[in-house]
UniProtKB/Swiss-Prot annotation:
Job of this protein: CRISPR (clustered regularly interspaced short palindromic repeat), is an adaptive immune system that provides protection against mobile genetic elements (viruses, transposable elements and conjugative plasmids). CRISPR clusters contain sequences complementary to antecedent mobile elements and target invading nucleic acids. CRISPR clusters are transcribed and processed into CRISPR RNA (crRNA), formerly called psiRNA (prokaryotic silencing) in this organism.
Top-level taxon: Archaea
CDD domains: Cmr1_III-B (cd09657)
Family under the similarity heading: Belongs to the CRISPR system Cmr1 family.
Compartment list: Cytoplasm
Listed NCBIfam families: cas_TM1795_cmr1 (TIGR01894)
Organism of this sequence: Pyrococcus furiosus (strain ATCC 43587 / DSM 3638 / JCM 8422 / Vc1)
Name by which UniProt lists this protein: CRISPR system Cmr subunit Cmr1-2
Name of the gene: cmr1-2
Main localisation: cytoplasm
Record's GO cellular component terms: cytoplasm
Amino acid sequence: MYEAIFDLEAITPLFMRGADARSPEFSSASVKGVMRWWFRALAGGYFGNNIEALKEVEEKIFGSTRNKSRVFVRAEVEDVKKGNIYRQASSWADKTIIVWSEYVDYFFFSVLDKRRNRKTKKIDIKTRFEYFDVGSKFSISLSSTDERYFRLAEASLWMTINLGGFGFRARRGAGSLKVQMLREMLL
């Protein structure tokens, strides 16, 4: 059996949820979904217009309604950090908090809830739900008995981590992870 364990750390806030929209969730199904997307993006160039061949290989790696996956994906949260986007921004940006605040507004406007305090006339900023903050640690494990499909899944995860992101607002820079350690084993 082939196995790889990716120890990861969030370098930008990660907005990923499950059935409970208020609490963060880092699930295997979500990770597998993003891996599948990157597999399609990369393998499309190899398979060209042969969509049936692409679909067949994709089903073997990630599974389908007819066949189970040949690669087992397990995602775990190791260390959760929760925070406030604006507090985090001020510690990063020191004297440029105004510029940073506008940046945060632009990238994370859909997850911020702004309300004006009637007494102080200041805007109170609260996030609408919890999220995984910078520094949260995760682990993703891939395992398979078939080396070919294992390597394809491993490449897909590698591309997801390095070129993509997890959760929503990933296209705006959220959900970026870095690999702390990669352990590969042949069992």
